[in-house]
Amino acid sequence: MNDPVDVLIIGAGASGAAVAWSLAETKMHILCLEQGGWMNPADYPSTGRDWEAKFYGEWATSPNVRGRPEDYPINDDNSPIKVVNFNAIGGSTVMYTAHWPRLHPSDFKVKTLDGVADDWPIDYDALTPFFEENDRMMGVSGLSGDPRSPLTHPPMPPQPLGRSGAIIGKAVNKLGWHWWPSDTTVATMDYEG
């Protein structure tokens, strides 16, 4: 390809794809490069009974373990944070579980509230319109009204709890603990965000 481009995006994971989406209606020529090919959803580990075992081999979160031809080693020996990445179209969203937590106002004031690190130079309210746009774009489903979280209004109703979730919810209620189902980016109705 020798055509000139206005914007080059390296990586079509969550961030790169969001940037490409936000620029799609401009007249700019956008090129998005990805390391790796398309993954077949039928091959995802969650489709088989041995899904847990696959996370220790061909579907490991670390390229150091996975060793696919598209992978490259990452030295994280001196880091308390171990790498989670995937080299394919969609990047690490291939490993993504659709859990969609939003930051809390307190996350922006860690120095003030907890005496560690620095407070952010902006607050939660400044980012609220962008959080809401992102929720609409991604198609977030969730339950509004959590008293311990910011007032969010996901565009779709929540996922059903399921048997395990109901059992855990009952046990947590018995302990008197607060719990709330997490927002997800799994559609619960027809949606075009």
Language-model region placement:
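N-terminal glycine-rich phosphate/pyrophosphate-binding loop and immediately adjacent elements
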Residues: 1-112, 116, 121-125, 129-132
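Conserved redox-cofactor binding core of oxidoreductases
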Residues: 56, 62, 72-73, 99-102, ...
